[in-house]
Amino acid sequence: MRIELRSWSSIAFLFTLFIAYVVSESNFKPDIKLTKEGEIAKEYNYFDDSSNILVLRKDKLAISFDDGVSWKNVKETENERVIRYQFDPFNNNRAFAFTIDKFQYVTNDKGETWSKFEIYDPKNEKEHLTLNSIPHILFNAKNPDLAIFVVYHCPEDKKISNQCVNYHFLTTDGFKSNPKSLQTDASICTFAKSTKSYDVGKDETIYCSRNKLNSFGHIVESYIVASDDFFKTESKINHALAKSGSIIDIRVLQNFAIVVVQNDKFNTKSKVSLLVSKDGKNFNEADLKVDISYGIMTFLESSSSSIFLAVMDYSNSFRKFSLSTVYSSDSSGLSFSKVLDKVQGGSIQKVETIDGVWLANIADEIKDNKGKSKTLLDMLMGGGIDKNIKSRISYNDGEDWNLLKINNDGSCTTESECSLHLLNPTEKSGDGKFVTGPTPGILLSVGNKGSKLEKDINRMNTWISRDGGISWDFALDEPCLFSFGDQGNIIVAIPYYGKNKMNSSNMYFSLDQGKSWENVALEIPIFPLTLTTTVDGTSQRFILSGLIDSTPKDKADYSFAETLYAIDFSKAFGGKKCDSKKDFEDIYTRLDPSNDKPICIYGHKEKFRRRKQNSQCFVNELFEDVKVYDDPCECTVIDFECASGFSRSKEKECKPDKKKLANICRDKKSKKISLPDKALASGNKCKNPKEAAKEFVKTKEFKCSDYLDEDDKDKNKGNKHDIVSTFNEFDSELQQYTYVEQGETYSGENIILRTKANVAYASNNGGVEFVKIPVSDEIVTYYPGLVPGQVILITDSEKFYFSIDGGNTFQKKTAPAKPNVIGARIISFDKKDTEKFIWYSSENCDNPFSRDCSLVAYITEDGGENFQKLKEDVRSCDFVADVFEDVSDEIKNMIYCTVEDKSSRKLMLLSSTDYFKQSKKVFDNVVGYAITGNFLVAATIDDAEQSLKAKVTVDGQIFADADFPPDFHVDSQQAYTVLDSASKAIFIHVTTNNENGHEFGSILKSNSNGTSYSLTLDKVNRNRIGYVDYDRIEGIEGVIVSNIVANDHSKDRKKLKTQITHNDGGEWSYITPPVIDSKGKKYKCNGKSLSKCSLNLHGFTERADYRDTFSSASAIGLMMAVGNVGEYLEDFDKCSTFISRDGGITWKEIKKGVYMWEYGDRGTILVLVNAEKTTDKLMYSLDEGDTWHDYKFAEEPIDVLDLATVPSDTSRKFLIFGKSDRKMVSYSIDFTNIHKRQCQLDLDNPNDDDFEYWSPTHPSTPDNCLFGREAKYLRRAIGHDDCFIGSAPLIEGFKVTRNCSCTRKDYECDYNFFRDSDDTCKLVKGLSPSNRKKEMCKKENAFEYFEPTGYRKIPLSTCVGGKNFDTWKVHPCPGKQKEFNKHHGKELNSGSLLAVIGIPIAVFLLATWFVYERGIRRNGGFKRFGQIRLDLDDDDFHPIENNEVDKAINKIVKGGIVIVAASIAGFKTLRKVDRMLFDKVTSSLFRRRPGHRNYVHVPEMDEEEELFGNFRDNYEEELEEGTNNINEDFNDEPNDYEYEEETNDEVDSRLFNIDDQSDEELQSATPEDN
């Protein structure tokens, strides 16, 4: 019994001890040491496998050797300004501290001691290099003594320029000595052995990119170089893509060497391509089938068998919060497939320590938004568009994605679409990276359960997973910052904030892998910043930093200090270490939720040993990483990937790839090829691969003729397989669409589209994909703004949607009233400020024709947040200050409005500079106004004459009369259309016949200030609403195409003929037709004049979309049109499609029939599509229209509505809209990959690149002079059809080689003159020439003016010298007689008289005496010369010639003989002429008496000699005669310019808002309009 009692006593004693132990553990509190700091640290980072921590605080470096308990400054850097530090990822003992001074620092003993090294200027090795950017170091994974110090250096005065370079400095002794400049002009360098797994080349192997620049700073060539001896020798790795583009990055990722190439080296936003190598020698292009820019591509954590990268949509203003698409490659790194799209921002994370497990947040459409307003968090989490964020997990490397399961919660199951959604599953590791944690499958995250991630962080909790993220348990109520220690056996968490969103006063910890949690109060509450521990997560110590208010009594002050807690858990469990046999369990990763069996990835499954959850001990293996044990799996089909020639389909099957097969056939030059469809993935560890291959790999045979065209060798057609067609379908018919110009806040080829169902769609990739803009309101219209990226969606209520990034994001706004319902425009935009615009609503307009109906204008300056009333009873308003060249502060806010006077019903023009607090009446009766270039033209009504008068201003304040020719009386019921002012002169079409169906008029052209107009072309066709057949050819100065009405006096249907001018309206001619048609047959024009057989083109008035023009400003000289060869323009069904390469001088028929056309890549890609018949094919040309090829873009024929591309015509994507089975569809046609290189531009060596110079000319001038100069434009050279132009700065190559002498082509008819049929300028009958005194004398420093000659210089012309047809008789300006006389030498004093008269007489007398002495007297005197017969040869006269002077003198003598003889003969002849004729000639030449000529005929250059003989010598006299005779009136000459004025129709005020025939309605034109 005593023994038993003793036994029971022992048991009781042990039980008591156990209870005490448990109680003590439950009451365990970690040791916490508090430190206060006055300055906030930039970051805290551990040395790996160490308790040493570095911190940078106010540019001073400090270190702790005891997990943050105590700190001291690094003494070696105490006197330095440290700007950054960096750890060596391959050497745990080494770190670097960078300063802005001459010394840099390195430690090789985890911060115990630091040594310094210096960086010297490579250009002057005696001087230290000044660091004006933060440097970094490239490390070698195999040899720690090798490293490269890299700094981006700019000259002091040029911080950002092409003179900035990357300097590379090499160390071979681990910085024991100063690094030496790496002798290579490299942009980017890296060690081949930058990762432990890339075992290619030597330790010394370095890859670099090198750019060859020209004097303009442009990259001419980019290539890769490799060296094994630090560039004593090197090898060049050539790749065509790299050579023509720009290498912007070289990196080694796992066992892949990757080169990132910017395809368009002149455009930083252009697409990039990847070149990948696994052997370091052969780089091949990866088939990443997506447009990506380097700034939006992120390389994710990858494996040795696959590259993972995320492509972020940076097109909107929220940038890093945008949505991403994730791609992964096969084991070669060359074939990519989409893994996941619509990833929220960068919210995708690989789970650490476990292969193939990824966590991601996906953005789903909100279907029940109901027009709710969005918060900023909505915008950020949804990438700028309302989205529901849902979390997914993949445990087979992205093959499948599943919802996150919550354990033991029957109310929330994945079957009911309820799951866990995570905000952020990462912690900050000891080295500063954000990772899921180096634990064996233990994860922690903030999130919430439900159908989506909440957008209020207060509704989120903290959750824990112990199976690598597949299933989760609730952990803590608050959202917390967290960190893991002792391989996940210690978890520390602190709430982001405390109660009432104040600072956190407590922290939590768990010692049983999150099963239970304890609470510890903090001595000082903080706003937590950092919670971290050692890099490998094996320590039992943590540091926690946070902000405290350093001035708590001052509530308005935002001064903060930092508090640092050092937390120690080493005394928990009494410091007990776990028993390796009792306290551990084996855990497999990636368990299949359906059967709890491990899932194999890369041919293996992993397991690791983990402490049991309830064991009360620590692993206590400090700095020992979690060990993972591999078990190989049997090979299955998932261990194989698609082989060469095959691509993975959406169904995850290996399908033949036409493009790849074509390339293989082309390379092998075989008729048939046999290929396996699959291959074992490189690096796969599965068992029995050969046996498995027999089961899973199939060999397939292909006929190359099925993949290669018969004309496959034709280089001009490219590879059709490189063209990509993408289909989209819409819910209703197309109503309007617009390309939105790229801006600073976004990039991309953005399109806004609206259907007839009032649903709006947006695309930011050129129409490859369209997304429905997620708004609940009907969009009745939209307006693109004048600032790139600005778009406003209009609803039928006060609500509107505002975007400044091209429609990527929209903000919901409220207007002061509904948009107007009377058909007026709804928005007027400011030219520069995106936040400023005018909104038009209507009041009392139930009956739009009621006198009470009023249009009210409101203005906003903050993007629609606030509005103020601008003016009532307006018709239209515009911000006009930025229209004018000189904008003073006085008019910077100037607005013009047309306002209706309710009493008189007249329309007034008002101006204001203070938003109509005060206003000025400019005109009291106007029809409207138009803005063109730097001019504002107002159409006023003269009540007395019942006529329209044009007024012009160039400063918004002073208006001048626009003087039309006097015979142009524009009735108040007629109209005129302002066409453009692109050539420094205003072109206006004045309607002269307004009869329905027979409308036409005259085009008038102004002088340079828009005030004086003359007729340039008559009988020009217009349509009912005022649009005119007038097309200014973009890209070439002065070329205009117009259609005239040939039967202007007939009531029959109009007969149109096309005319073209090449000198800005100075001369017009019919278009010379091609000789043969597209089938090689000759046109029947032989023997016919150009007026009877010419090329006639359908013009502006007949276009379904007014944005479709003959030409493109970026495709210099190219024109396409639909028309016919004949006397008149025929109907469309009798027309063909034509092309010109020389600005409309010569033409070629492309195809019979009517086709729509578009230009791409500045004319290197031309596309046609049938406009009349259903079709599934398009035609394209890659050689400026020389050859054409078919491409099938659709599965079945469609009715094409429109063919479009970006307005600049620089894209390589096109968009076809059409109808198919009553559905509206679109096809994006992408030619991006058809050119394999970018055209090389080398302005220093223009003969060695892909461009050539081309000069526009006038068809009748042979000397390449146009507008008084010979201009040369760069175009892609003929035959260089295998490259694209992109954003090459061709404008920098533009040059004017010379200014030409003035000729007739540089002049046009002056005011009151008209061009007659004989091409001369004649005075309008009954009129007198204009007085130019006022115009010319008001110019600064002017002192003279000229009488008009009937001609004036074309404003564009820069000719010098030559024939000045516009200047003859000169007069002094009032008060400028003295300056005038001085300039013309009429102000003579005694000195000037001597210079002008005396000196020439003296010289003449001296010369005469010398000639007499040496040439006449000693050769026999005058007697000898009297014997000379004029009909004898020179041999009869033999003068004395002893030297060269004698010879010269005797030549003068002989010349004198001829002159005297000619004079005598001429006098004798004149004596025989009738005296009256003689008097007439002399008076005409010398007395300037009025005669009988009222015009001057100046023939063409090739006619001049034949018609007028010595006209060139006497053209001044001809002009003089004309000048003095133009006042003569001849009643017997018929007046061919009498017009009937029609007054039946009311003026359409819209005509006065036409600016280059493209106002807001043109920007959003509908293919079916008109």
Curated annotation (Swiss-Prot):
SMART domains noted in UniProt: VPS10 (SM00602)
Bias (Acidic residues): 1529-1546, 1556-1570
Superkingdom of the source species: Eukaryota
Lumenal topology ranges: 25-1390
Compartments (UniProt record): Golgi apparatus, trans-Golgi network membrane; Prevacuolar compartment membrane
Topological domains, Cytoplasmic: 1412-1570
SUPFAM superfamilies: Oligoxyloglucan reducing end-specific cellobiohydrolase (SSF110296)
Keyword Cytoplasm appears in the UniProt entry: no
BNR repeat windows: 63-72, 105-116, 463-473, 508-518, 801-812, 858-869, 1138-1148, 1179-1189
Topological type in the membrane: Single-pass type I membrane protein
Disulfide bond annotation, renumbered to this chain: none
GO CC annotation terms, alphabetical: cytosol; Golgi apparatus; membrane
Transmembrane segments: 1391-1411
Entry-linked InterPro entries: Sortilin_C (IPR031777), Sortilin_N (IPR031778), VPS10 (IPR006581), VPS10-sortilin (IPR050310), WD40/YVTN_repeat-like_dom_sf (IPR015943)
Protein name in UniProt: Vacuolar protein sorting/targeting protein 10
